[in-house]
Every structure is written in C-alpha cells, then in structure tokens.
C-alpha cells in the first residue's frame, strides 16, 4: 500500500513538473497579448479556427489560446488566471480530472479548455450540479467567451425545444447533469427530426465530478409515463403495515437497506386480507404492494429521505441534502410513501426511457472533471471512466487546522457538547459552519441553538432558493450557519462576507437590478466592500471560519468536502468532528470494541473521549463502506453495460430512421426478416417438405405480410426452403410497391417513419420493464450454482432478439394494412399505431373461416379487441 502511495505521489510530482514547463510557455506569451487591442485579441479566435482548418492540432494551439483567454479575462472580469489555474486547464483539456481545493477558482479554470475545444465548432458542454450554478457561470464566464466572439448557451429545466436547440448549437453550453441526460433520452424518443436538440457528444467538463460520477452513479435518469393501475391497494397496505410489529412481523436489515416479512407477519397479512396464500400466483401483485409498504414504513424516514411539501412527497438527495423535484422512487415505493403520509397518490409510472450517468457521460468523445476531493476515489475514476486524477497545488499554502475527533457515548451528549462549543466560539465573534447529514438533524440542532439564544441561519433542502446567499455570508463576523451536507456547494465562503451579494440584496429590496441603476450598484458595492474588508481582518485574527461536523459520513470524501469550506486560498481556518456511538456509521459499521472500551474506562455520557483506537476504528469503518459502495457501483455498471449495448443499438437505428436515412430499405429488410422467420417456423429444418405446414404459413402471411393474397398451399409445394423465402419476399415487396403507388411515395415515407418509431418505442418500453423484472429475480440463480450475471446476459440477449422480432412483425403488419389513407384519416392511423398492444407473445394468424368473437383481437391488426375497434358498430 505504501509503495502504491509513493508511486502515486511520484507520478503526480512528475505530472506537475511537466505542467510547469507548459505554464512557463503560456506565461512567456503574456507581454505579447497585453500589447494587442481588444479587436486584435478578438481576431485571434478567427485566426485559430483557420489554423485548425489547415491541420494544426489543439495541443499545438494550447499555449497561445490559453494566453488569449487569460488576457480576455483580465480585461473583461478583472480576473487573471494564476499559474495553478493554467495547470488545471491543461489537465482538463487532456481529458483528466483536476483536483483543486475549494476556493481555487475552478469556475475560471474551465474557461481555458472550453475556449480551446470550442474552436473546433463541435460544441463544449460544461456540466454543473444545479440550475443556479449553471445560470451564474453561463452569465459570469460567458462575458469572456462573448468578448472573444464565441456563443454561449444555457440548458435548464422548463425550456422549450427552440430555446434548447439554440442553446446546444452554441459554441459552449452550460447546464445541469440531469438536463443533459434527460435531453439525450428525449431526443431518442423524438418522432420528428425538428424535436432533436442535442448535437454529437464531443467534450464535457464536469464541475463537482465526484458528486455526479460517483455519488449519483447509481441513480438512473428515468422518463416515465402513467401506467393504468388503481391506487387503492397502496392505501390498504399502508394501513396494514402500521398494524405490524417490528421484529415480530417483519425484520429490518439496515446495512443491506432491506425489510422482510416473517412467517407470523405473512399469516397476519393473509388474515387481514381474507386470503389463504399471499404467495399464490394470483396474488403476485399483493406481495409487490406488501414489500413496497414495508419499505416505506420501516426504511424511509420523513425529513431524512424525503419531505412532504404542498401535499407532495419530494425526495431528498442523500449526498447534497437538496430537494429533487420531479424525481420519484420506482417500483411503487413512491406511491407507498404517499399512502403512508396520507397525501394524494400519483399514478404509478411505466419507464419509457432510462440511462445512468455512468453510461451517459461515457458516450462523450472526451470527458474531464474538476473537484476539490477526487484522490480518495482515484481508483474508481480510472477503472470505470478511464480518467486519471491530477492533484493541482494550491495557489497559497493551506494553513487550516484539522482538530482530532471528539467522541461521545450518546447522540444527546454529542449535541449538547456541540451547542456548548458553538456558544463558546460565538462569544468571540468567530464565524462557524455546522455540517449535518439530514434535514431532521439540522432542525433539531437549530431548536437547541434557539433555546440558547444563539442567532443562526439554517441551510437545508427546504430553503435551497436562498442557498447561495446564506453560504456567501457564512464567513461574516459572528455568523453561525447550519448546513445539510454539501448544500451551497459551488459558492465560496469569503471571510468577512461577500460585498457583491450584500449590494445585490439591498438593490433587490428597492426593486432594482444592477442593470437598472449601475451607478447605485457601484456605490453600494463600495460601501459594503469597506465593511467586509474590516470584518475580514477581525475574522482572520479570530482564526478564520471554524467547521463543526456533527457526524462522520460513510465516505471520507464528503467529510473532506465539509472541511474544505474553511482555509480557502491561504485563509486561516479550523475543523473538528463530533461523533457519538449512536451515529449510523458507528452503529452499523463501527467496532463493538469502542462501546466496551468506554464502559471499561467508566466514562459517563457527557465525558468525551479522544483515543487513537477510536480514530482508527472510524477510518476502518469508512474504508469498509467505501469499498462496499464501490463494489455495488461496479456491480450496477456490469448489469447496466448489458442494457447499454442494447440501448445504443436501438437508439442508433432509431436515429437513422428519424433522420430519414433510406427508410424504405429498412422496411424491405424487415419484410425479409419476417418472411424468413415465418418459413423457419412453419417449414422447420429436419422436417420433410411434405410435412411442412404450408396452410399455416399462408394464414400467417395473410395476417402479417401478404394481406388479400390468393395463394394456395399447392402454389408453394415442390419448392426448396431458400426458393420459398425468395418467392414470398418478392410477393410481399410487389404488394408493398402497389401500396406505394396508391398512397404516393412521400406520404408513405412519412408514415413509415412514424410507424417504425412508434412501434420501436412501444416495444422498447415493454423490454425495459421486462429487463427490470429479470434483473430483480436473477439473484436467485446463485442458489442453483449459476452466475447471475452470466445468466442475465444470456437471457437479456434472448429477450432483445424477441423484441426485435416483435418490432419487425408489427411494423410490417401495420404498413401492409395501410390501404389508401387520405390526409384527414392520418390521425386515425396514428391512433391505431399509438394504441398499446394487448396481446403478448407471437400473434396467431387470423383464420378466415373463424367467426370473430367480440373479445377476440381485431383482424385489422390494431391490437384492440374486435368490439372496441371494427366491431364497435356491429
């Protein structure tokens, strides 16, 4: 391990040495750039583009391009890139992760590689964690790009197609990870080329890369539609599980985040429902409801996992503490929580399209990222994303003091001690930032501080609109701020306060903006600058910002992020964690020896302990959890890779159809595939030709690819299998040619595209559901001494092939039955295509001699029952 670390440090030192040489090259160009007029500096952009067109590489252009951006930034924003920021920019351009400590100006660093790569004209995406940061950075850094003649776009929630399309066509586009991912999924559900907004995925720079690629790696982006199911059962089961006794009727495994009913519990539920066997086939839906209700009751905690706001259950992001509007738990869990809380149950949803961040961002040709804490997860970045981490030195030496952890026996004693520590430091005027792991804990601590008469600000997911403003002032004299986890990430805490925010606040009270009255804004800024400068001196004398962690997170990286809020850019600062043996990490993963040690020492509740054994035990517990989480993410990726290959295949074919790449060829290929499969089914290999089911084949042909044919079994007799396929394919294509003459080529091409896209989307949706069910049950194969992943791969390929066959069959059936459709009738055709298919499995040929029952599938091929389709007026 030590050898590995030594190599790692040596590698990083070598990397810094290499980067220093390039930085010197950029610095040597600075005097030359300073002599240029604004017009001459701006003209450099056109010159660089011409040089790229002539074959010059971006690496060759880098020193000059970076020097141009640095000079533009100095003129436009009054901010000159430091040497360490230039290093960060080079690392990002090379498709790596730059670890830069909090306050080192990551936002400004991104302008360097963004400008250089945007010169190709292929578009650069800068990805942030929330809408506020995306807007702020697009507006703030956008001034540099616009000065240099590049366009800037912004992609946030709630924009329409035209706005998004324009934003993606810009040279540099800012947006959130969610929006980029959802736009990709929406593009792959588009029915018309005009609805597609994204260009190719060329280069992405991810801010807070650890948050997006690691913390959210297991969170899939899902676009869903409503499924037609009643919600009554959720209320029924919410009442039932409230009557069950924990430990007696069900068991909870907090480590595995699982809950299981016991035999006694199952009997109790059966009695309440008045049924004999809950696990009988016909009660499968009931077991699903019971499991969801138990999870909602026993595992999901209000104000920790979710909040109830305006009659809605809203998920809380466990890593940032932010509310995740629009996100819902899947598999009925969200509905079960709604029933538990007694709010209106939203319709259960069906997945229409899904992708994980892991797979979305791996599609970019070049990927880079920035964060203050990546080193602890370097292994994961390299293994999963093929991204190496370079630790960039700080501009000024770090002088923050990280004090040893203080451990208490109970949570009550811990919070009591925290309040005492806050009161002691607050008396001196030192600013304090307290990090909590949940909304519930932050509100509890807030109540305790209120009772002590300590004024403070609470920053949690419930008030994230005020996030940046509160965080920006957390460094003021006497400020006490409670923040859940990493809420407010991306906003610097300036010692003494942020004069710009204070000036803006006062302007807002007057109902004005800086654009309305620039003179007044400048006056206010000068006034507050004087105040904050005075406060800055006092705060520095008091030791800077003090961080109090109320609990160790299961990831060391999150703890480091909290600590990193203090001691920015050479400022003084300090940090300390207060821990109790009742904290989740200690309870679930800590050693039992610690409680024993405290008992042996005869310590009472209020006496803290600082002991090397305990510090080691905490670190061991964190490493254990980190390794477990890495294994889970790796495991998720292995399964998702199977799905990803299928998604890429479906989406690439879908795009070809969407953009009209010879759709007729697609249709012909589908006809050939359908005919070949039909001949294989009715005339199997190894069966004598005299025993072939030619009658069945012709009935199937009539139903699918040759409606109204006049062929008889005798016409097909004495023909070899290959010749039979060729004969039927030719007949089907001839028939389709007639359809084209009747309808007109242009109208048919439009309908072909529409039918193919709709059928593909329908079948893909069903396939996603089936794959989810397969994945949920596949773990049981391990009991049969089989590798679940291998089994999953085998079965998913079979399911995928079946889906492709079903797509081909349905498309051919619909297109063959499109007799002359006049313009006003197009909507009816679309309704037929959009209708959900009710039949599962291979569709049986329609037999002409049979009487059609009212509940039989309609022979027109719509998939509806006869009584609801052509037989409606019969």
Swiss-Prot record:
Its EC top class is translocase
Q: Which UniProt keywords apply?
A: ATP-binding, Cell membrane, Cytoplasm, Membrane, Metal-binding, Nucleotide-binding, Protein transport, Translocase, Translocation, Transport, Zinc
Q: Which domain of life is it from?
A: Bacteria
The UniProt entry, under InterPro entries, shows: Helicase_ATP-bd, Helicase_C-like, P-loop_NTPase, SEC_C_motif, SecA, SecA_CS, SecA_DEAD, SecA_motor_DEAD
Indicate the principal place this protein occupies in or around the cell: membrane
**Gene3D superfamilies per UniProt:** Helical scaffold and wing domains of SecA, P-loop containing nucleotide triphosphate hydrolases, SecA, preprotein cross-linking domain
For whether the record's keyword set contains ATP-binding, the answer is yes
Q: What does this protein do?
A: Part of the Sec protein translocase complex. Interacts with the SecYEG preprotein conducting channel. Has a central role in coupling the hydrolysis of ATP to the transfer of proteins into and across the cell membrane, serving as an ATP-driven molecular motor driving the stepwise translocation of polypeptide chains across the membrane.
What does the subunit section of this Swiss-Prot or TrEMBL entry state? Monomer and homodimer. Part of the essential Sec protein translocation apparatus which comprises SecA, SecYEG and auxiliary proteins SecDF. Other proteins may also be involved.
Q: Which family does it belong to?
A: Belongs to the SecA family.
> What is the name of this protein?
Protein translocase subunit SecA
């Amino acid at each position: 391990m030590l050898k590995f670390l030594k190599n790692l440090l040596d590698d990083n030192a070598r990397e810094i040495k290499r980067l220093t040489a390039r930085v010197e090259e950029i610095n040597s160009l600075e005097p030359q750039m300073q002599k240029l007029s604004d017009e001459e500096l701006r003209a450099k952009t056109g010159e660089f583009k011409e040089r790229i067109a002539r074959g010059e590489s971006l690496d060759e252009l880098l020193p000059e391009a970076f020097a141009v951006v640095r000079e533009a930034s100095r003129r436009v924003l009054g901010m000159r890139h430091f040497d360490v920021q230039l290093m960060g920019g080079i690392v990002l351009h090379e498709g790596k992760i730059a670890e830069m400590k909090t306050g080192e100006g990551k936002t400004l660093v991104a302008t360097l590689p963004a400008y250089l790569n945007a010169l190709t004209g292929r578009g650069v995406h800068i990805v942030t964690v929330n809408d506020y940061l995306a807007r702020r950075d697009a507006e703030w850094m956008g001034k540099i790009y616009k000065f240099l003649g590049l366009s800037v776009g912004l992609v946030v929630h709630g924009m329409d197609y035209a706005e998004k399309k324009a934003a993606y066509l810009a040279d540099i586009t800012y947006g959130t990870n969610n929006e980029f991912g959802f736009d990709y999924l929406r593009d792959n559900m588009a029915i018309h080329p005009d609805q597609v907004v994204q260009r190719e995925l060329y280069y992405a720079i991810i801010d807070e890369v650890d948050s997006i690629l690691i913390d959210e790696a297991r969170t899939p982006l899902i676009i869903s539609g409503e499924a037609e199911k009643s919600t009554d059962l959720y209320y029924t089961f919410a009442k039932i599980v409230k009557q069950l006794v924990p430990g007696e009727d069900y068991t909870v495994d907090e480590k595995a985040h699982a809950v299981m009913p016991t035999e006694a519990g199952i009997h109790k539920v059966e009695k309440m429902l008045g049924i004999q066997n809950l696990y009988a086939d016909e009660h499968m839906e009931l077991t699903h409801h019971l499991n969801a209700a138990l999870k909602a009751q026993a595992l999901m905690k209000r104000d920790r996992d979710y909040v109830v706001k305006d009659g809605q259950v809203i998920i809380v992001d466990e890593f940032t503490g932010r509310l995740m509007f629009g996100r819902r738990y899947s598999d009925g869990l969200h509905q079960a929580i709604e029933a538990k809380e007694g709010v209106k149950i939203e319709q259960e949803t069906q997945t229409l399209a899904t992708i994980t961040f892991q797979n979305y961002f791996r599609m970019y040709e070049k990927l880079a990222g920035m964060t203050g804490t990546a080193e602890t997860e370097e292994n994961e970045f390299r293994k999963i994303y093929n991204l190496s981490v370079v630790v960039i030195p700080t501009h000024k030496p770090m002088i923050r003091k990280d004090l040893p952890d203080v451990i208490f026996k109970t949570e009550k004693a811990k919070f009591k001690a925290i309040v005492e520590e806050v009161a002691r430091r607050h008396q001196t005027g030192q600013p304090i930032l307290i990090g909590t792991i949940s909304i519930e804990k932050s509100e509890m601590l807030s109540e305790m501080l209120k009772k002590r008469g300590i004024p403070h600000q609470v920053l949690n997911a419930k008030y994230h609109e005020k996030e940046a403003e509160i965080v920006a002032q957390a460094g003021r004299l006497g400020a006490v701020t409670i923040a859940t986890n990493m809420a407010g990430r991306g906003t610097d805490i300036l010692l003494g306060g942020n004069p710009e925010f204070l000036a803006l606040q006062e302007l807002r009270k007057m109902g004005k903006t800086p654009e309305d009255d620039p003179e007044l804004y400048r006056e206010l800024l000068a006034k507050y600058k004087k105040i904050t400068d005075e406060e800055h001196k006092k705060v520095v004398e008091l030791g800077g910002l003090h961080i109090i962690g109320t609990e160790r997170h299961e990831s060391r990286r999150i703890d480091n992020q909290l600590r990193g809020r203090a001691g920015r850019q050479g400022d003084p600062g300090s940090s300390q964690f207060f821990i109790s043996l009742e904290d989740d990490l200690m309870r679930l993963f800590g050693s039992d020896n610690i409680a024993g040690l405290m008992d042996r020492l005869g310590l009472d509740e209020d006496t803290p302990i600082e002991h090397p054994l305990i510090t080691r035990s905490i670190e061991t517990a964190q490493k254990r959890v980190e390794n477990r989480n890495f294994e889970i993410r790796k495991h998720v990726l292995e399964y998702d890779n199977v799905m990803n290959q299928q998604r890429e295949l479906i989406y690439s074919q879908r795009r070809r159809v969407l953009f009209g790449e010879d759709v007729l060829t697609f249709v012909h290929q589908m006809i050939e595939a359908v005919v070949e499969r039909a001949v294989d089914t009715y005339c199997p290999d190894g069966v004598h030709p005299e025993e072939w089911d030619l009658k069945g084949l012709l009935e199937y042909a009539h139903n699918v690819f040759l409606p109204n044919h006049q062929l008889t079994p005798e016409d097909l007799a004495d023909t070899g299998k290959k010749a039979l396929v060729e004969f039927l394919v030719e007949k089907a294509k001839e028939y389709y040619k007639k359809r084209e003459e009747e309808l007109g080529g242009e109208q048919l091409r439009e309908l072909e595209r529409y039918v193919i896209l709709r059928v593909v989307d329908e079948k893909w949706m069903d396939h996603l559901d089936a794959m989810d069910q397969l994945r949920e049950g596949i773990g049981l194969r391990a009991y049969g001494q089989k590798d679940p992943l291998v089994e999953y791969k085998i079965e998913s390929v079979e399911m995928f092939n079946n889906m492709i066959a079903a797509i081909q069959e349905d498309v051919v059936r619909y297109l063959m039955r499109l007799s002359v459709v006049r313009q006003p009738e197009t909507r009816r055709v679309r309704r037929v295509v959009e209708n959900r298919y009710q039949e599962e499995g291979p569709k049986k040929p329609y037999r002409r001699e049979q009487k059609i029952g009212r509940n039989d599938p309609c022979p027109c091929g719509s998939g509806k029952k006869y009584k609801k389709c052509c037989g409606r007026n019969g």
